[in-house]
Regions:
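Short metal-coordination and nucleic-acid-contact micro-motifs, chiefly zinc-binding Cys/His arrays
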Residues: 80, 97-98
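Short, surface-exposed recognition loops or helix-turn segments adjacent to catalytic cores
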Residues: 78-83, 144
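N-terminal Rossmann-like or analogous alpha/beta NTP/dinucleotide-binding catalytic cores
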Residues: 1-74, 88, 129
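Cys/His-rich microdomains that often coordinate metals
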Residues: 91, 107-108
């Protein structure tokens, strides 16, 4: 367990607080009444507390990201669509609910930027097999929903880097790109 400390909303909130993003997340985690204090108060323990700003985590993410690129699972393209900053999520027009983010209901804004994408479409058959032929997804009633809503219409490749802000793990082979926060946290 640990904390997910990168992304546009962290960068924005740190700027609003007159702090660097690192100082901002340090205060949230280590400061008085921060995450670590709250865990002690609630008697929560863990084997290892991982912060996504830890050097070893950043190095591991960069290594995995580069390997995925070298294997052809990541390619450079351009993202154009709607973006919800609080959710740190990209959306297509058809996914919006009354023109707003389907997750949080907040306003979205137009976004266009160079980005790297993960070839999720390459793995559609494997994902479908995993869903339909194993007990991977629980409850099982969700299998049809996933297959019909995501697999059959065609899995879209996923945006895995950002260029419109800098608070994140740098893509070491392409300056100006940072690893998208949700990918960064997945490798935790």
């Amino acid at each position: 367990t640990g904390t997910d400390e990168h992304g546009q909303k962290i960068e924005t909130k740190a700027e609003e607080a007159g702090m660097t993003p690192q100082a901002f997340v340090d205060r949230i985690v280590e400061g008085e009444r921060g995450v670590l204090d709250l865990w002690k108060l609630m008697n929560i323990s863990n084997d290892r507390f991982i912060r996504t700003t830890d050097d070893y985590h950043c190095e591991a993410v960069q290594k995995i990201f580069k390997k995925m690129y070298e294997n052809g699972d990541i390619y450079k393209g351009a993202y154009k669509g709607k973006y919800c900053t609080p959710c740190e999520s990209f959306w297509t027009e058809s996914q919006l609910v009354d023109g707003k983010c389907p997750d949080c209901g907040r306003e979205v804004h137009d976004a266009e930027e160079e980005a790297y994408f993960f070839r999720l479409s390459k793995y559609a058959d494997r994902v479908q097999h995993l869903l339909e032929d194993t007990d991977f997804l629980q409850p099982r009633i969700r299998v049809n929903e996933m297959v019909n809503n995501f697999i059959k219409p065609g899995l879209e490749d996923l945006c895995v880097s950002r260029t419109s802000f800098s608070w994140g793990i740098p893509v070491d082979f392409d300056p100006g790109h940072v690893v998208y926060v949700w990918v960064d946290a997945l490798f935790n």
